[in-house]
A protein has these predicted regions:
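S-adenosyl-L-methionine-dependent methyltransferase catalytic core, i.e., the SAM/SAH-binding region
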Residues: 1-150
Length: 150
C-alpha cells in the first residue's frame, strides 16, 4: 500500500472490493480525514463491507464504471483496480466460474442480473457469441470458439 497511499488525508477508490482485503489495508494507512470509496457488484462483497464500521469508508454496490457518478474530477489521490474473478468466487461451485468444480454455468458477478452464461450459450446465435468473445474477451479465435459452442 506504500506505493498507493501518497496522501493519508486523500480520497481513494477500491474499484474491486471483493472480500475487502485491499480496502482494509488502505483504511489502515489513512488518517481519520482520509476517505475510501469501494465498489463491487457482488452480494457477498456487500455483506463483507458491512463489517467495516469506519466513518471514512463507503461501499457502493455498482460497477466501477460508474465512478463519475460518485467522485468529482481531480479529487482522487489514488485508485486500486484488481480485475478478474476473486478466489472466493472460484471456490463457490454455485457461482459457475471455475472449471475445476461442478456447478451451474452461471458466471454472473452481479447475482441479481437475470442473464446467465447458460442462457447466452443456449439462446444466442453463433455471431452474437463470437462478438461477445471478441469484444469483451479480446479473443482472437472468437469465431472458431463460437462455432464449437453452437
Amino acid at each position: 500500500m506504500n506505493s498507493l497511499i501518497s496522501d493519508t488525508n486523500g480520497l481513494y477508490l477500491d474499484c474491486t472490493f471483493g472480500r475487502g482485503g485491499h480496502s482494509i489495508k488502505i483504511l489502515e494507512e489513512l488518517s481519520p480525514e482520509g476517505r475510501l470509496i469501494s465498489f463491487d457488484l457482488d452480494d457477498a462483497a456487500l455483506e463483507a463491507a458491512k463489517s467495516i464500521n469506519q466513518k471514512n469508508f463507503r461501499f457502493i454496490k455498482t460497477n466501477f464504471s460508474m465512478i463519475d457518478d460518485y467522485v468529482e474530477d481531480n479529487s482522487l489521490s489514488g485508485i486500486l483496480i484488481d480485475c478478474g474473478v476473486s478466489s472466493p468466487q472460484l471456490d463457490e461451485p454455485e457461482r459457475g466460474f471455475s472449471f475445476q468444480t461442478k456447478g451451474p454455468l452461471d458466471m454472473r458477478f452481479n447475482q441479481k442480473q437475470k442473464l446467465t452464461c447458460k442462457d447466452i450459450i443456449e439462446n444466442f446465435s453463433e455471431k452474437e457469441i463470437s462478438t461477445i468473445l471478441w469484444k469483451f474477451g479480446e479473443e482472437k479465435e472468437s469465431r472458431k470458439i463460437a462455432k464449437s459452442i453452437v
